[in-house]
């Protein structure tokens, strides 16, 4: 359950709010842990592991963090989104999180921004 506590800290340190995050990549060591994080943080399910989590893609022991970062970065670039929060659960309830930003983000072509301009 560590990501439920690590994600808000990382997001706050980045000067953002949970609403600013376009996608959350949360390691799915266990389904119950990810469901808890979604409910505890009040996240929209469509913004969490949209390409499938470790249960669907596999749990690459020893390289979970790398897989999460690459998946999040690819999602941001492919969908012209700006921010992702990436988080790992660690044994005994600990967690780690980071926020990444798409350096190629173009707000003029972002669907949500375009709608907001109308």
Where are these regions (language model features)?
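Claisen-condensing/thiolase-fold acyl-transfer catalytic domains that form or cleave C-C bonds
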Residues: 1-117
């Amino acid at each position: 359950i560590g990501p439920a506590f690590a994600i808000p800290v990382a997001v706050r340190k980045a000067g953002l709010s949970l609403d600013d995050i376009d996608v959350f990549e949360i390691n799915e060591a266990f389904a119950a842990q990810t469901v808890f994080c979604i409910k505890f943080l009040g996240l929209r399910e469509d913004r969490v592991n949209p390409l499938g989590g470790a249960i669907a893609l596999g749990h690459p022991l020893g390289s979970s963090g790398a897989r999460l970062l690459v998946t999040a970065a690819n999602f941001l670039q492919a969908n012209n989104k700006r921010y992702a929060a990436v988080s790992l659960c660690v044994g005994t309830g600990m967690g780690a999180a980071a926020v990444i930003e798409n350096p190629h983000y173009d707000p003029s072509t972002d669907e949500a921004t375009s709608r907001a301009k109308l």
